[in-house]
Every structure is written in C-alpha cells, then in structure tokens.
Amino acid sequence: MRTTPLAKSSEIERKWYIIDATDVSLGRLSAAVATILRGKNKPQYTPNVDTGDNVIVINASKIKLTGKKASDKFYYHHSEWRGGLKAVSYGELLANNPVKMVEISVKGMLPKNTLGHHEFMKMHVYAGEDHKHEAQKPEKLDINKLI
C-alpha cells in the first residue's frame, strides 16, 4: 500500500523572497504573498504544516488602488467602548500607514488560527526601498510572473 508523504516542519527549506509593490494592485499582491507564505507554490504543501517561505515586501507606499477604493472603501476597528467605532478610508491609510494596509489585506487571506499567525509572522513589509534583511540574501520575485 502506498502512502502520501507528508511534509514535516523540520525537513522544509525556507527561502527568502523580496517583492517590489510598485504599481501593483493591492489584491493581486496580497494573493501572491499569501500563496508564498502558505507554501502552496511548493510540491510538498501540506495544509496542517507551515511549509511557506519568508517574504519581504518593499515600496508599500507605491501600491496601486483600483477604482474608487481610495475614497469609498473603509477600514473599521472598534475600541470596545460605546461609540468607539473608528473608520479610516483606504486612501488615508495608504498615505499615513501603507504597511498596515498591506498587512491587513494579507492577514485576511491566511487561516484564522495558530498556523495562520505563524505564517503571517514570516512577512516583512516596508514602505520604502530599504530593508534590514540583506544577510538572508533574498531572491527577487517579479510579481507580474506570479499572477
């Protein structure tokens, strides 16, 4: 009888990838990053094991929002106090904190459990070109070839 080989977290080789977000749609970027973080682009993908790679996203401030999302789409959060609902438009969020906008988008595409949290911790987002992960020798990925 043949059995399917299951991946073990100790046997997985993790790579570092760097993705430039300049003029890339937010949803397409987030979907590609979530796929790499989950490890779905690898042949040894196993749903209950963290098989993904580390991803560095640079130039988050130059991301593209299509349509009227900059003015019509809002990010809501609540302070848990009565009347504490806060709403920030995506255009305002892109101007003030583009890193948070990318993190919210990618986090929504990952599982809502402990494994999803571990996968999310392997993503590093920077608003500009500079990042502090040169020692890991990240491979540059062209986002247009992934989507």
Swiss-Prot record:
InterPro entries, per the entry: Ribosomal_uL13 (IPR005822), Ribosomal_uL13_bac-type (IPR005823), Ribosomal_uL13_CS (IPR023563), Ribosomal_uL13_sf (IPR036899)
GO molecular function (one): structural constituent of ribosome
Gene this chain is encoded by: rplM
Protein's UniProt name: Large ribosomal subunit protein uL13
Signal peptide bounds: none
Any single GO BP term: translation
Function: This protein is one of the early assembly proteins of the 50S ribosomal subunit, although it is not seen to bind rRNA by itself. It is important during the early stages of 50S assembly.
Family statement: Belongs to the universal ribosomal protein uL13 family.
The entry's keywords: Ribonucleoprotein, Ribosomal protein
Oligomer and partners: Part of the 50S ribosomal subunit.
CDD domains: Ribosomal_L13
NCBIfam families: rplM_bact
Keyword Ribosomal protein: yes
GO cellular component terms, A-Z: cytosolic large ribosomal subunit
PANTHER family registered for this protein in UniProt: LARGE RIBOSOMAL SUBUNIT PROTEIN UL13M, RIBOSOMAL PROTEIN L13
